[in-house]
Swiss-Prot record:
It holds the Pfam family Nramp. GO terms for biological process: iron ion transmembrane transport; manganese ion transport. This is Divalent metal cation transporter MntH. Belongs to the NRAMP family. GO terms for molecular function: cadmium ion transmembrane transporter activity; manganese ion transmembrane transporter activity; metal ion binding; symporter activity. Residues 1-20 are annotated as: Disordered. It is found in: Cell membrane. It comes from the Bacteria. It comes from Listeria monocytogenes serovar 1/2a (strain ATCC BAA-679 / EGD-e).
Amino acid sequence: MKKDKTERTKQSWRKAQNAPSLSEVNNSVAIPKNAKFFRKLFAFMGPGALIAVGYVDPGNWATSIAGGSEFGYTLLSVILISNILAVLLQSLASKLGIVTGRDLAQASSDHFSKPFGFVLWILAELAIIATDIAEVIGSAIALNLLFGIPLIWGVCITALDIFLVLFLQHKGFRYIEVIVITLMVTILVCFGAEMVMSHPDMQAIAKGFIPQSEIVTNPAMLYIALGILGATVMPHNLYLHSSIVQTRQYARTKEGKKEAIRFSFIDSTFSLTIALLINASILILAAAAFYTTGQHNVAGIEDAYKLLNPTLGSSIASTVFAVALLASGQNSTLTGTLAGQIVMEGFLNIRLKPVVRRLLTRVLAIVPAVIITALYGANGINELLIFSQVILSMQLSFAVIPLVMFTSDKQKMGEFVNPTWLKIISWAVAIFIAVLNIYLLFYTLTSL
């Protein structure tokens, strides 16, 4: 009986897998076999941090700053709901990778026709380039704020971090995870310090985590709320997570997969909770520093930087803010380039040298950023940042819907298939995200 189940699971894929996802690091991180719970958990920790990076990239900053400065603490509940959706989707992505041994790109390539698979690849690449644009812009703005480096040169300098990724991956996947975790802690500490300096209203913060009807009835508030939701769940993260969970040397047996799914869920939930704290801190800072002082129209990251020192009365407030921004941009770079490699290998089975793949992704992100900066300066950069988030919104459903399809398919997942209650919730979330992003796209196009 068990053998029959295995055969049916194998037959649900149209073709054999050519190579594992991210083959150079696949199954490379040792898991102690007879260790106690916390030692095993420590070995599994890491992929969640790489995923959480996508939830605190520079693209998220703009929506949180706008929400806090214009509406105070009210939209904290939206950040909380977004995080709950993220935990659900990331748990599905990691389960897909652990159970099937395929990442989301490989699974999509196998399931769909070649023409449709090619379309999905193009959309995934556009999402990764859009993500990289946000990271390039965030890092360039941070370099400008900290060191006075012109934006156009800051954009070009960001190309150098490709070599950091290559060096770390050569040293071992754990090194990438350690750097990412260090930068995440840096961002959290920076915003923790900013919050202390801003003296927020704790009672208003607690109330902000309770959803208010005003979020739906106020069109301006609803638009920013949808922007927060749309910018939180990143499509490239679903491809990335389904791949990097396979870096662990868990037993590829029923019990081994069950254990890996459990530890992966703890890892990603913990890391996404840190991301929640960071995003909430950004909104709280904007509410305390700007909303309560009557500055309701803080247009972007640079405006927030300039206003922090005089508003909080501290000479280091803006510097700490810029350091956090630089850490955010660099962190996102590390994960975005890995995602690019995953989708190209998964959809097209093209295995470029890592340096070529990373240079390709970065060049495609830097070129539009350089052109816009040269022609329109800082205002153009902010517009490009917003446009990159629109591109991400358009692509998200093309990653979420296949993910829910595959994890709800008994032939593909066997006994690990989503139970009925999870299928219902997952499809409801997928439909909600699709409707949300159609609305966001329509609103953006009609307001041009």
